[in-house]
């Protein structure tokens, strides 16, 4: 309970850390504040758990105002119960009328400041949520259906968005490159058009702090008429990643929304592996967003799945990219 590991494994961990000259130890799981402190004392190294690692990655990726607010909110919620201190700075500060009374400890002051900062960020995120709700309402009045790209992180959602709409959204081969939802209009040859939304990538056992902080972003999925589930066909844990995304969508009560499974990065597979995946996922669409292979079949599938309303009252501003 105190160290997660038994004495033997703890000794083995210390030896491995010495041999590898490691200054940081990461546990693939969530540790309690007491366990983090105990492990840091025993190993004399910085210890991170899985949630803190994901939050650190998010902090590096956040560039927009909304993204930074959401990451800061998640970090504060994670940090709040883990505030500890044992030095003279934690002595009670003078407080009360005329300097009498116990006052607050520094620890209590830090916790109060965190609570105040969380309340302020919540207010700002509520403002962003209202702005996005207004945008969604305007799209609904125009009769534009919405298709949202969902999937495990680094599955190629942003690359697919760029390929379909000829945009230049940031798309990199790394985890959580996209934090904020990006929307683009997509016009089909039959004069139909829809809004295509790119969202933050999922990960198995998504930390609850992230789910709460990114609620404003994930609301884009709730307004979607179609979910395009993009999966990395070349990843060795494809099945687990698809199951993780399905589980998160089920938790968000989005099972009723029509969904298309897309096996991206098909060009990286050998013929034998392609046959295996076709048998395992017969309804999935194999594509390569990078080489644009399979995009015609995807566009036809989207057109057949979306319930198109009359486009007579849709106001079209400027030339729109087409799907070829």
For the regions a language model picked out, list residue spans one by one:
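Conserved P-loop NTPase architecture
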Residues: 1-146
């Amino acid at each position: 309970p105190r160290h997660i590991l038994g004495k033997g494994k703890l000794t083995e961990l210390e030896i491995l850390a010495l041999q590898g000259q490691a200054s940081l130890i990461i546990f693939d799981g969530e540790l309690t504040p007491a366990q983090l402190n105990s492990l840091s004392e025993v190993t004399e190294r910085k210890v991170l758990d899985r949630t803190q690692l994901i939050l650190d990655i998010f902090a590096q990726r956040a560039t927009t105002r909304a993204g930074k607010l959401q990451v800061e909110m998640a970090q504060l919620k994670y940090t709040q119960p883990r505030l500890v201190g044992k030095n003279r700075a934690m002595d009670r500060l003078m407080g009360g009328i005329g300097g009498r009374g116990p006052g607050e400890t520094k620890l209590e002051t830090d916790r109060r400041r965190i609570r105040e900062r969380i309340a302020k960020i919540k207010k700002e995120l509520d403002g962003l949520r209202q702005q996005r709700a207004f945008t969604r309402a305007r799209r609904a009045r125009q009769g534009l259906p919405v298709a949202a790209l969902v999937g495990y992180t680094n599955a190629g959602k942003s690359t697919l968005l760029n390929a379909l709409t000829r945009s230049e959204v940031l798309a990199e081969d790394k985890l959580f490159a996209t934090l904020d939802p990006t929307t683009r209009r997509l016009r089909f040859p039959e004069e139909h058009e829809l809004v295509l939304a790119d969202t933050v990538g999922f990960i198995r056992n998504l930390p609850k702090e992230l789910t709460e902080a990114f609620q404003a972003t994930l609301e884009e999925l709730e307004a979607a008429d179609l979910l395009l589930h993009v999966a990395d066909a070349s990843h060795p844990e494809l099945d687990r990643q698809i199951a993780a995304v399905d589980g998160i969508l089920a938790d968000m009560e989005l099972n009723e929304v029509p969904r298309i499974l897309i096996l991206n990065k098909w060009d990286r597979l050998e013929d034998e592996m392609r046959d295996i995946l076709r048998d395992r996922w017969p309804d999935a669409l194999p594509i390569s967003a990078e080489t644009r292979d399979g995009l015609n079949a995807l566009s036809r599938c989207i057109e057949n799945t979306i319930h198109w309303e009359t486009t007579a009252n849709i106001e079209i501003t400027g030339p729109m990219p087409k799907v070829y």
